[in-house]
Amino acid sequence: MSDRPPLPPFDRESALTKVQAAEDAWNTRDPERVAGAYTVDSAWRNRDAFFTGRPAIIEFLTAKWNRELDYALRKNLWAFGGNRIAVRFQYESHDGRGQWWRSYGNELWEFDEHGLMRRREASINDVAIAESERRIFGPRPAGERGIEFPLQ
């Protein structure tokens, strides 16, 4: 198995790098690419859904991005220690009827010794927004990396 740096234990710089890498991958909306950052038996809780393994992750993300159109995400480091990282995030997307949503969430991540995520727990709340209220347009520009995203 090849390593996926940075590897635990995390310091502030390596945790920030891991968070930005996750944001970048999720903004591709490529389920296969995203799933590659997780162990083959990674355990997930996403809202009220529980599942395990890369095939289930790919299935979940495929359905998610078929439903959450023009998805764009921002993640910020919240805390880290040892092989764990906590993040807060916001993403925006619209549904098939054209209603825009901003989703606020927190994630708890646990990594194996190779830098692959073996556990992900996500709690998420959705808020309907007007298209004119959007703040997230595609992947984060290079000049905005490392900048804390505002709560509101």
Where are the predicted features?
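Short, low-complexity N-terminal intrinsically disordered segments enriched in polar/charged residues
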Residues: 1-40, 147-152
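A solvent-exposed, acidic/Ser-Thr-rich amphipathic alpha-helical stretch
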Residues: 14-16, 31-85
